Amino acid sequence: MARDKVRYVGEAIAAVAAESALIAKRALSAIKVEYQPLPAVFDPDEATRPGAPVLHDYAPDNLTKHIPIRVGDVEKGFAESDLLVEETYTTQPIEHAYLEPEAGLAYVDHDGVVTIVSPDQNITHHRHMLARILAKPISKVRLVMSPVGGGFGGKEDMIYQGMLALLAMKTHRPVRLVFTREESIISTAKRHPSRTVLRMGLMRDGRICALEMKVICDGGAYGLSTEGVMRKAAILAAGPYAIPNVKVDTYGIYTNNTPSGAFRSFGALQTAFAMESHLDICAERLGLDPFEIRRINAMRDGAVTHTKARLTSVSLTRALNALEKASGWEAGPPNSRGDTREDLGRDDVRPPCALGARFKAAEEQEAAE
């Protein structure tokens, strides 16, 4: 819950335990809160400007994480290119919209062990966090993971478990909490909104000479998974393509928006959307087929990524060939053929972009594997 300062609309400031939901609602309505307006910032670009309100007293600015990656000489690659294409791509915050809202049960047994039963996607980390919050040894905190009624990464962050545990300790009774859909939407983390500026240099035959990408993600008020998202975005920025010169910068920024957290494709979606969209634009300007420009630049077996990881097996070209055949692409894109989704019996096909990734020790390069 907020302490001294509320940083986003939807942040909890008080919790009430009652015999019924109706009584709890009446008790909540009786609480009167006086707010003192404070300067706020809702745009990541504005949050990085001199004089912008700093959200957290312990931090010198609103930057949560910056991940730089450098390979080769980007400016030289641009100078040698026949075509330079620069575009900006944005993605929005997205609600997880799982069927089951946040819910949990907490109780304290005769040995003083606090038990929380909840659909939790990050149970080990949350156990350690709760031990700190409750000022208890880890042996006195027990988490039980109930079946998860949909998560998609949205239940990796600890939003309500601390309140549950504290209420159980204060009341000495079991406490159950179930968010309404409105409470779930307003208070829980969303996918990181992003703005990506992508500049690419290519030869006339479609070979990519250089890539420069700057990704700014809105971490919201607390940036719950922002550091991990920024690392993954940087590692996967160039996609499964062999590019000799790469410059990538990913930035996570605090704002007074709803916190951003984990969502499926953890950090990969933002950069993949920009990269794949950009390749389509470049293919059109060069008069190349979208599948062909990807085949030209696709990594092969034994390729080394821009984070120095060697890939022993790369199936991209095989996947592209299979997708091209399955989509009937040789007859032209579906929209140019006048086909509808019902005619095709499937969605339009997009070439995939995916690599696994792990983070190595500080003295080693970030590596995708």
Predicted regions located by residue number:
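Structural alpha/beta core scaffold segments of enzyme domains
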Residues: 1-369
